[in-house]
Amino acid sequence: MGNGMCSRKQKRIFQTLLLLTVVFGFLYGAMLYYELQTQLRKAEAVALKYQQHQESLSAQLQVVYEHRSRLEKSLQKERLEHKKAKEDFLVYKLEAQETLNKGRQDSNSRYSALNVQHQMLKSQHEELKKQHSDLEEEHRKQGEDFSRTFNDHKQKYLQLQQEKEQELSKLKETVYNLREENRQLRKAHQDIHTQLQDVKQQHKNLLSEHEQLVVTLEDHKSALAAAQTQVAEYKQLKDTLNRIPSLRKPDPAEQQNVTQVAHSPQGYNTAREKPTREVQEVSRNNDVWQNHEAVPGRAEDTKLYAPTHKEAEFQAPPEPIQQEVERREPEEHQVEEEHRKALEEEEMEQVGQAEHLEEEHDPSPEEQDREWKEQHEQREAANLLEGHARAEVYPSAKPMIKFQSPYEEQLEQQRLAVQQVEEAQQLREHQEALHQQRLQGHLLRQQEQQQQQVAREMALQRQAELEEGRPQHQEQLRQQAHYDAMDNDIVQGAEDQGIQGEEGAYERDNQHQDEAEGDPGNRHEPREQGPREADPESEADRAAVEDINPADDPNNQGEDEFEEAEQVREENLPDENEEQKQSNQKQENTEVEEHLVMAGNPDQQEDNVDEQYQEEAEEEVQEDLTEEKKRELEHNAEETYGENDENTDDKNNDGEEQEVRDDNRPKGREEHYEEEEEEEEDGAAVAEKSHRRAEM
């Protein structure tokens, strides 16, 4: 049994081992097959790569062979072209040698001709050198003469300038003194005007108070008449009571009527006093009024309640009531006098406050008139309210009148005080707003004036630049024409024309001087006609250059044309002077008409006086600006004077005719320098007048 069991176990083990070996063998075979397959695939891929590489190499070899064949063909073509080019070059070389030989022969012939011409020009140059030396000597002599005359004129100019500066300083002092006097007079006039307005307002207030007092007196009279009628009725009732002995003891209703009759004057007076206290705002008078009215009221109460206790007193006559009424009249007069005093004190306080506000804010007369009108309207409104209060308090002469307590009166007074403070604050704010508006307007005007001044200065600078550029251009043209004349060998004709030009320029300068001396109306030309009149010296220089330069040109043969142009210009001068005179006459006529209109309307005169007070500062600013303009113009005149002198020195090198012209021009300018200053001053005065007229 044991062996059988062992054999079985060994079989099983053997079987399992066999199975394992089979399995492992199968797995090993599979792995070998897989590796062989992979190696086969790699070998196929390598074979494909080599095959493709071989194909590409064969294609490249074919391309190389084709390119080689093409290069061989192109090389053959280039060899043929090179042979042709070599043959053409040999032909061109022969032709070039022939042309060079011809050019050398031509240049030699030209050189010989130019050499001959050069010798001729040398001889001409030597002749011109001699003429130039002669002209230099003449120029030196004339330069010495010119320097002497220039120094003399400069000394005269400095002397005249010093004299004019002294005169101008004196005139400035006189103008300053006159302005100070004018300011003082205007201040005095303004103070008197304000005082007059205050007095007028006080007079109006007093008239209104007088009317109010008349109304109160009439009301008191009507109340007294009503009281007298009630007293008469009371007498009749008393007589009837005395006649009927059974009605000695009065009814309570009659007793109430009696007390109402007794208290009616007191209630009426208190009600009458209430609106006056609301308008006048005087607290102390209320206490006085109540003190005056309290004692008679108590006496009447005691005397009127007495008949209820004793019948004998009803038989007495009503004399105590009349005595009380008579006593009350002087007390009412005293109260009215106290009211008047209080009103006067309040008016004085208001006047003092107004003066204080005027000193702080310094309002204009127009603002004061506006404030007074507003105050007058407020007072009229208060009077209307008072009239409505009267109508509401006692619409008829009834005995029952509502009495106002002291607490309510105090509240009413506080309310009125707050209202007055608010109104005063509103007035101050309104005044400040008006003052700021005026300041803004003044600043805007100053800015506009500055902008206008800058624009004028820019225009003057542009004009000066143009005037400086024109003479240089003309001088260049003149020099070019002079050299052309020298090239054309017409030196002798140029000298003759230069002499004629000198004579014509001298005559024209004399004519200009005669016209300037014989035409004094041109001094008063307005300054604001255009930017050209702002710089008269530069304009005169430009006119002289335009008139003289074309005639001085040595190549210019048209003397007749220049003479005709001068005649036309001289004929046009009287027409321009007539137009200027007509414009001045029109301005004077407009000023006379405005003066007449202002004289015929007194309200307009007062308004103009107020506007003059406001325009003082603007006029001072304008005068300062005009003075600065004058200084700038004088400085520009001096600079242009020096530049013109330098230009004359440069122009003397061109010929004798230019020296004569440059000598005459500064002389004429120095002679007319005073006239130009007067024209500038007159123009500034006319500009100020026109500006004032525009503002008016």
From Swiss-Prot:
It is a single-pass type II membrane protein; Lipid-anchor. Keywords: Coiled coil, Endosome, Glycoprotein, Golgi apparatus, Lipoprotein, Membrane, Myristate, Phosphoprotein, Signal-anchor, Transmembrane, Transmembrane helix, Transport. Residues 2-12 are cytoplasmic. The keyword Lipoprotein applies. The modification Phosphothreonine is found at residue 626. Residues 122-145, 244-391, 427-696 are annotated as: Disordered. It comes from the Eukaryota. Residues 35-244 form a coiled coil. The chain crosses the membrane at residues 13-33. Phosphorylated probably by c-AMP-dependent kinases in its lumenal part. A lipid is attached at residue 2 (N-myristoyl glycine). Residues 80-175 are annotated as: Endosome targeting. The modification Phosphotyrosine is found at residues 613, 673. InterPro entries: GOLIM4. GO terms for cellular component: cis-Golgi network; endocytic vesicle; endosome membrane; Golgi apparatus; Golgi cisterna membrane; Golgi lumen; Golgi membrane; membrane. The modification Phosphoserine is found at residues 364, 538. Belongs to the GOLIM4 family. Plays a role in endosome to Golgi protein trafficking; mediates protein transport along the late endosome-bypass pathway from the early endosome to the Golgi. This is Golgi integral membrane protein 4.
